[in-house]
Each structure stands twice: as C-alpha cells, then as structure tokens.
A protein has these predicted regions:
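Copper-binding active sites and cupredoxin-like electron-transfer domains
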Residues: 2-388
Length: 388
C-alpha cells in the first residue's frame, strides 16, 4: 500500500512538472487523451441548457464550423449543416449520341491542420478541402468524368465503388504529388457508393479523411423527399489505431447542438455510408420511429423495416421514413461508446407551418472549375475507351 501511494505521488508530481514545462515554453499543447476523457465526463448542453439526455455525456462544447480557432486560421474541416443536403451534379454537357456527361474536379491535399473538436487539431487529408469530400451525384447511364488533381505531398488516387474498367479503378494508377488523372466511366447500377483514396497504407489515407459519397439515381426517379447524406466516421487523434472521437458528418456531437429540422409527415431519405476505420462495425439507431432500409440502395424495394442497421467498413444503405408526431427524436450509434464520444444527434420534427424549406444544395465540382486544363500540373494520360 505504501509503494502504491508513492507511485501515485511521483506520477502526479511528474505530470505537474511536464504540464508546467509546456505552459512555460508557451507551446500550443493539447493532451488529446485528456480531451477524449473530458468528452466523456461533461454533460451535453444546447444553447447553454441541458438537452435532457443525461445518459449521453458529451463535451458540452461543439465546434463552430464557420469560425477560426486557436492558432489555425480558416474554417473548420466541414460545416455539417451545409454538407447534409448538398449534392454536386457536376458540369453537364452532352455527347453526340445524346448521352449526358457529368464532369467533376476533385483536388486532394494532405497538408492541412484543422480543428475537429474544441481544442483538438488534426492533420486532415481532404478532397476539395473538406471531410467528407463533396457528394457526387449522377443518373444511371451518365458518363462520369472526374478530373483528379493531387495537390498533396504524398501519392493519392480515387477508387469509386461500382462498375467500371480496371484502369479506372484507382488502384494501379497512383498519382504522385502535383500529378493529374482523368477517370471516366459510365454510371452503372443505381445506388449509393463510397469513393476514397486507395493508396497504401489504405487505413492511413482513409482515416485521415480522403473519402466521400457517390450517388447514382435510377432512371425512374425515387419519390420526392427531403434528402440528406450522413457519413459515419471518426478520428484516431493519438495514432494508436483506436478512435478517440466518433461522429456523423465529421464534427462530434454537432447535431445534438444543431438538431436537424424536418417536416412532420414528409418523406425523409438518408444516404448513409460507414467510413469509420479501426472499428469493425458501426450502426444507426433511430428513436421513436422505424425506417425502410434499402441496402446499398441498388433496389427500389426495401429489404427491411427497422430502427437499427449495422454496417461494416464501406457498407452503405438508404433509409426512408417520416415522423407522425412533432418533437425531438434522437439518432445515434447503438454502440454506446461511439454515442458517448460524439456519434449522436437529434431530429427536430415540426409542423409544416413552423419549418423553413429544406431544399438540397448543389455546386459545380465543389467550388472547383470542372476543367482539368485550369490546373497547370503534370498530367497522367490514359488510353482506350471507358466502356459502355
């Protein structure tokens, strides 16, 4: 017992000395493990008031995505509200045979340091400056042209799940820094797909943020709905292959502090993708309701009517539901550790007269010119047609 007390005292003194040394040196030092522990201990608040969900303990503070923090200038890595309902339909043109061409530009960078939670900074790797990258959207049969530019310091690529030729798979044509590549393929098999860097070590490129969502709509459109994209992700901030923070759309606890407003009785469609590294499974549980589950989104007939779906890494689904009653309804990972470390949010269901219109946004290539000629970098050429 005496030895134990001495050890504790020594450790405590050493910790105090180290903490003082960092403070005296004037360094911007963040103890990420302590931050993760604090995130578990502090109660969540919304606008300074308790949310009423005492079982879910959160940081109490949430990152404001439109402001700058600490020593890092510029916005946070994503605005979850803006991302939620934004779809990039690309620059549209027509081929001689009448086929639609959708041209996108994705720029990879691996040199940014951004804040992912209050006081927690991370070396983010991004497509077009955000995690996740822009949501690319097309209709089955469209010709997809992705102008890829590697503005990073490491080799990168783009691997899009779905049907395409081998040379368009993003595995063998690694693009070196300052290089370019043009991916071309037809949008085949409607559904929801992830895209991500496929350079090894793969877990490093994905866990740092090089991923996004690619949606192929069926030729006969799905019923009109309030559509949104949710990527389940997380961050290993101390690099021990165990995540310290979990989220949907990158910012932990964000939708607890900023509930997603939806209209009572209106059809909601969620494109859900699991891009969480290091943990083998993730899931989505909805309170007070059930949803029609379309696994991979490759069928127009639902696979299941449920309030819970579990996914492995890279799996995805479409969820459709509507709420009969107004109020606040939680959604979260049913792996409690994930929820208590950030993967938790709220839907705020309102009568139509009380809610602003929630229309989907759009952009042209995530703010980048769709033409690859706009970027005077080394070009990697390809040969052959793109298939039919």
């Amino acid at each position: 017992m005496v030895i134990t007390v001495k050890v504790i005292v020594i450790v405590a003194v050493a910790a105090a000395v180290l903490s003082t040394a960092f403070a005296v040196a004037g360094q911007s030092f963040v103890d990420l493990r302590a931050t993760a522990q604090d995130a578990e201990l502090k109660k969540n608040t919304i606008g300074g008031h308790a949310a009423g969900y005492g079982l879910y303990e959160t940081s109490g503070d949430v990152l404001d995505p439109v402001n700058s923090y600490g020593n890092v200038s510029g916005p946070a890595v994503i605005d979850p509200d803006k991302y939620l309902r934004s779809f990039d339909y690309g620059r549209v043109s027509k081929l001689a045979n009448g086929s639609t061409v959708r041209e996108f530009t994705l720029v990879a960078d691996d040199r940014q340091v951004m804040e992912i939670a209050p006081g927690v900074f991370y070396n983010v790797w991004t497509f077009n400056g955000t995690i996740p990258g822009p949501t690319l959207r097309a209709t089955e049969g469209d010709l997809i042209r992705i102008n890829f530019i590697n503005n990073g310091s490491k080799p990168h690529s783009i691997h899009t799940h779905g049907i395409h030729k081998s040379e368009m798979d993003g595995v063998f044509e690694t693009i070196n820094p300052q290089g370019k590549f043009v991916y071309e393929f037809y949008a085949e098999a409607f559904g929801v797909y992830p895209y991500h860097c496929h350079v090894t070590p793969l877990e490093e490129h994905i866990s740092h943020g090089l991923y996004g969502v690619y949606i192929v709509d069926p030729k006969t459109p799905r019923p009109q709905a309030d559509e949104m994209v949710m990527i389940m992700n997380g961050f290993d901030t101390d690099f021990d292959t165990e995540n310290n923070f979990y989220a949907v759309n990158t910012i932990p606890y964000y939708y607890m502090h900023h509930p997603i407003e939806i209209e009572k009785d209106k059809l909601v469609r969620v494109y859900l993708v699991n891009m969480l590294e290091f943990d083998q499974i993730n899931n989505f549980h909805l309170h007070g309701n059930l949803y029609q589950l379309y696994r991979s989104g490759t069928n127009t007939t639902p696979d299941e009517y449920t309030d819970m779906v579990t996914m492995s890494q890279g799996e995805r689904a479409i969820l459709e539901f509507n709420f009969k009653y107004p109020g606040q309804y939680m959604f979260h990972a049913h792996k409690t550790e994930f929820a208590e470390k950030g993967w938790v949010g709220l839907f705020l269901v309102k009568d139509p007269s009380q809610i602003q219109s929630a229309s989907g946004g759009g952009s042209s290539s995530g703010g980048y010119n769709g033409s690859i000629s706009s970027y005077p970098l080394t070009t990697t050429t390809i040969s052959g047609d793109v298939g039919t």
